[in-house]
């Protein structure tokens, strides 16, 4: 890594990002197993290797998208408690706040997709905004950092909902 924090291996970073972007089963936190130690060990190893080879930024970006594949927690709220613990423990690390969290929000939005029904007063985005806002309130005490992330996700859906409503008003009223 050079003094600017950018990877020296830009071409390889992009390839590494593409490889990580295709993985959707989180070690230690998936529908088959929930093992915090396995997850923590895996993520530590990934970060160590990324740092060693100068891929920190690319890996941080990719990890955000990757962790957005988390299953719901035992309480039915996304993300799983293991991922929530990761956010609570690492939220103030620059790689998490600058790269990982924004890509987590975008990644979750992207694989849920937009479901727009033109000319309809209700839409998927509005429903999702309400869901994530309610979930953020429910976990706020135990997982304040994750609650903040869910609020960002809710805000993203709220913005999309308003954009859809504006188009609806313009073209379907």
Model region roles, listed by residue range:
Residues 121-133:
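Short amphipathic alpha-helical heptad-repeat segments
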Residues 146-156:
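Short, charged, amphipathic alpha-helical segments
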Residues 1-110:
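Non-catalytic all-alpha helical scaffold/repeat segments
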Residues 139-140, 157:
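Residue at a conserved register position within TPR or TPR-like alpha-solenoid repeats
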Residues 111-124:
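Short, charge/polar-rich alpha-helical segments
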Residues 157-171:
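Amphipathic alpha-helical coiled-coil segments
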């Amino acid at each position: 890594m050079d003094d600017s924090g950018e990877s020296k291996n830009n071409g390889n970073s992009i390839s590494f990002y593409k490889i990580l972007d295709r993985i959707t089963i989180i070690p230690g936190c998936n529908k088959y197993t929930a093992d915090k130690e396995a997850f923590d060990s895996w993520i530590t190893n990934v970060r160590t290797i990324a740092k060693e080879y100068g891929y920190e930024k690319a890996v941080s970006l990719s990890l955000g998208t990757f962790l957005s594949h988390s299953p719901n927690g035992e309480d039915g709220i996304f993300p799983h408690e293991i991922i929530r613990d990761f956010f609570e423990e690492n939220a103030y690390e620059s790689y998490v706040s600058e790269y990982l969290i924004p890509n987590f929000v975008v990644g979750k939005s992207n694989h849920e997709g937009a479901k727009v029904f033109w000319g309809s007063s209700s839409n998927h985005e509005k429903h999702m905004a309400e869901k994530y806002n309610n979930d953020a309130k429910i976990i706020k005490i135990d997982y304040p950092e994750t609650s903040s992330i869910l609020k960002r996700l809710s805000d993203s859906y709220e913005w999309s909902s308003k954009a859809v409503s504006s188009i609806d008003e313009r073209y379907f009223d």
